[in-house]
């Protein structure tokens, strides 16, 4: 039920060309919404602490210099980020309509996706909201999303009527 509801919300946003920042499971959902698949179980991308909670690990990734993500962050290249997921997207699973813009150096998994056919649709596998675990310039992702959302909100069709998004 959660997947259906989240896919419906994501598809409604995509149809309206709303800006979308999809984080972790959101990036995976973005790939599925565009017709891609997931690797179902990835060992080593998170650890379990003694209290039973999942904790993030760290790994290196490479951000493609010509990508939208690199433009938002101000640079491409190698960076270290957190990892806290057990599913993921590799090249064979990636939706054809999406562009991979960052890869894990260790295992080649896709760490960021973007939609070239939308104004601002970016998905990242890491948890950008955990500021202490990402480079400082990664805050640009949120700032760029806010700016795009403000621009979008000024358009007449920006806010859908509640009846358009009926529960599943």
Model segments located where?
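Amide-donor transfer/coupling interface in amidating biosynthetic enzymes
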Residues: 2-16, 43-168
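Catalytic nucleophile loop
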Residues: 5, 12-37
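Class I SAM-dependent methyltransferase SAM-binding "motif I" and its flanking Rossmann-like core
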Residues: 40
């Amino acid at each position: 039920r959660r997947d259906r509801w989240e896919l419906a919300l994501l598809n409604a946003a995509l149809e309206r060309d709303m800006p979308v920042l999809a984080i972790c499971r959101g990036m995976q959902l973005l790939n599925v919404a565009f017709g891609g698949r997931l690797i179902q179980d990835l060992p080593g991308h998170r650890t379990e602490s003694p209290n039973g909670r999942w904790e993030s690990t760290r790994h290196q990734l490479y951000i493609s210099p010509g990508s939208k993500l690199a433009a938002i962050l101000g640079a491409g290249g190698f960076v270290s980020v957190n990892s806290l997921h057990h599913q993921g997207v590799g090249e064979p699973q990636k939706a054809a309509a999406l562009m991979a813009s960052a890869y894990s150096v260790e295992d080649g998994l896709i760490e960021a996706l973007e939609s070239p056919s939308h104004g601002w649709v970016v998905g990242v596998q890491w948890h950008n909201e955990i500021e202490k675990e990402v480079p400082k310039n990664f805050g640009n992702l949120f700032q760029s999303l806010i700016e795009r959302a403000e621009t979008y909100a000024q358009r007449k069709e920006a806010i859908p009527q509640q009846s358009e998004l009926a529960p599943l």
